[in-house]
A protein has these predicted regions:
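Positively charged, low-complexity intrinsically disordered leader regions
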Residues: 1-35
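Short pre-catalytic strand/loop immediately N-terminal to key active-site residues, enriched for Gly-Thr
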Residues: 36-46
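Alpha-helix C-terminal capping segments
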Residues: 51-62, 84
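Conserved N-terminal subdomain of the carbohydrate kinase-like
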Residues: 62, 66-154
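Active-site beta-loop-alpha junctions enriched in small/polar residues
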Residues: 126, 155, 186-190, 216-217
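Catalytic-core regions built around general acid/base machinery
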Residues: 166-178, 200-207
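A short helix->loop->beta-strand "cap" motif at the edges of active sites that frequently abuts
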Residues: 173-180, 255-259
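Conserved phosphate/ATP/ADP-binding segment of small-molecule kinases
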Residues: 191-261
Length: 261
């Protein structure tokens, strides 16, 4: 039986997807060792948007990843890893030291949990190439040409002011070109404050078609008088169906461009 999706249509694999974000070197101690006890690390690569691109590619979807990495062995290895998983990397920018002073690839250390011990992540991503690149050099109209779907998250704009501008500009260009846009707020408290995240991510909402989650966004009861509160205030962490539905309806009333939450 064929199922029709109102966003994808009946042939989702005919869609061309592009995502944008930071890809990082992932270092993991083998055999569930703790980082402080490790004498060796297994190397791989990851990042929220890169993982989305990889997952889509593994499902047979035409998937492209856009990012900035240093033009050295680490950056080239990250690109090779993506390509080995059938992710297109044609738009990727490999930078020289005169373009991004630190010219480094972000890194994170993953301590894999075992039993009741939770996993642990340590990030070392400040001054990575993507946070220092001048994106005014990028022709976003040309970058998004030929794609049907753009996926972004709230992680990338939290990295640096230049990334914030990039994400908002990409959303505006994608909307103008008629791409379907999905956005995952994906709040990270180690990167910015709750209010900073809410302020920026709310700016993104007019350009989004598919919204993943209802935070971090402002949904003011009165746009001109914020003292009246947010429609989400007082909603429990485990809301009833009726409570969820009311919030969804409020979002759609405020942002009729939203096709799916």
């Amino acid at each position: 039986m064929e199922h029709f999706n109102p966003i994808l249509g009946s042939e989702p694999n005919g869609q061309k997807f592009i995502t944008c974000g930071e890809i990082m070197l992932r270092l993991t101690p083998p055999n569930y060792e703790k980082i402080r006890m490790a004498s060796a690390f297994e190397a791989s690569y990851g990042g929220s948007e890169a993982n989305i691109a990889l997952a889509l590619a593994n499902l047979g979807v035409d998937s492209t990843f856009f990012s900035v990495v240093p033009n050295n062995s680490l950056g080239k290895s990250a690109v090779r890893w993506l390509r080995s998983n059938d992710v297109h990397c044609t738009p990727m920018i490999l930078t020289e030291p005169d373009e991004t002073p630190s010219n480094r690839l972000g890194t994170y250390y993953l301590e894999t949990g075992y039993g009741i011990r939770a996993s642990k992540v340590i990030y070392d991503r400040k001054h990575s190439a993507i946070t220092e690149y001048d994106f005014s050099q990028v022709d976003l109209d040309a970058l998004l040409e030929g794609y049907d779907w753009l996926h972004l998250s709230g992680i990338t704009p939290a990295l640096a002011p230049n990334c914030r501008s990039l994400i908002l500009d990409m959303l505006k260009v994608a909307k103008k070109k008629g791409l379907t846009v999905s956005f995952d707020g994906n709040f990270r408290s180690t990167l910015w404050t709750w209010e900073e995240a809410r302020d920026f991510c709310t700016e993104c909402l007019p350009y989004v078609d598919v919204l993943l989650g209802i935070e971090p966004y402002h949904l003011w009861k009165d746009e001109n008088d914020h003292s009246k509160g947010d429609w989400k205030d007082g909603v429990p962490l485990q809301p009833s169906y009726e409570q969820q539905d009311e919030i969804f309806q409020r979002f759609i009333e405020r942002y009729p461009n939203l096709k799916c939450i």
